[in-house]
Amino acid sequence: MQIQDRFMSPQWKARFKGYVQVTKPGIIFGNLISVAGGFLLAAKGDVNLVLMLASLVGLSLVVASGCAINNCIDRDIDAKMQRTCKRVTVTGEIAVGNVLAFGLALGVLGFSILALFTNALALLFAVIGYIVYVGVYSLYMKRNSVYGTLVGSFSGAVPPVVGYCSVTGQMDMGAAILLLMFSLWQMPHSYAIAIFRFNDYAAANIPVLPVAEGMTKAKLHIVLYIAVFALVSALLPLAGYTGIAFMAVTCATSLWWLAMALKGYRHGVDMQRWARQVFGFSIITITALSVTMALDFQVVSQAPLLTLVK
């Protein structure tokens, strides 16, 4: 009874909630959708449920690990931002050392699952994505360079490629398109956040594009990246990996997103409201494409660009 009372206590519940929050569940959920999309696109209807579950769980734990460690690294700048100033690593509700140990444990477990159940190429992409996010982006680029978003976009594009390569074991044209497509999507998505969170980033002296080089350049980059994203997304059906349904969805969502981005050039536009709309529709776009490519796959024969034997 004493053990049960302990786990039901408000203090324990708050502590448990804090550990969950440092893993950023929203980011994990978004990555789950993209991993599943990449996996099912590659599986082409022949789904190994054990492999799929291992890919989803393993990658989710790796993402959770990266997010937890990012909380530790960013605690000084998080303290300066209204959105993040109440994170447990800032308030001290949970010791930074405990969060770091928790994050490392999640990473070990996640990578172990990927190593045991997937293949060397899927594991390699997960490792590279993790190193880029934690080691390159979080530790240095985010704080010191306007190109931090560009570097971080690679790690954000890794999950669907891990899902895809878990099935194929090779880096073919389909995997390359996914990597480029999701990297391009990250840019306007992130710049939109930087615009409607402008004051936070400025207060923390983080050199995101709107802060470092102005709103005008950020708006232009958003429009250009969405336009290129639309073209790259169309390569999946053009290369025969998906069918007409994916082409219809990618054209509809990408063009609507582009039209929404162009509204940023209207005279007197409310930049905060506009950026939130661009951000919100970016999530709708990538979710719709992930779901559609999982359902509208086509059987193609492609020579691998890279193959690693497990």
Swiss-Prot record:
What EC number(s) does this enzyme carry? 2.5.1.141
Quote the pathway field.
Porphyrin-containing compound metabolism; heme O biosynthesis; heme O from protoheme: step 1/1
Where in the cell?
Answer: Cell inner membrane
Asked if the keyword Transmembrane belongs to this entry, the reply reads yes
Instruction: Name the source's superkingdom.
Output: Bacteria
GO terms classed as biological process: heme O biosynthetic process
Keywords carried by this UniProt record: Cell inner membrane, Cell membrane, Heme biosynthesis, Membrane, Transferase, Transmembrane, Transmembrane helix
List the GO molecular function terms.
Answer: protoheme IX farnesyltransferase activity
InterPro entries referenced in this protein's UniProt entry, alphabetically: Protohaem_IX_farnesylTrfase (IPR006369), UbiA_prenyltransferase (IPR000537), UbiA_prenylTrfase_CS (IPR030470), UbiA_sf (IPR044878)
Q: Which reaction does this enzyme catalyse, per its entry?
A: heme b + (2E,6E)-farnesyl diphosphate + H2O = Fe(II)-heme o + diphosphate
The membrane topology of this protein is: Multi-pass membrane protein
**Entry's transmembrane regions:** 25-45, 49-69, 87-107, 120-139, 145-165, 176-196, 220-240, 242-262, 277-297
Q: What does this protein do?
A: Converts heme B (protoheme IX) to heme O by substitution of the vinyl group on carbon 2 of heme B porphyrin ring with a hydroxyethyl farnesyl side group.
Family according to the record: Belongs to the UbiA prenyltransferase family. Protoheme IX farnesyltransferase subfamily.
Q: What is this protein called?
A: Protoheme IX farnesyltransferase 2
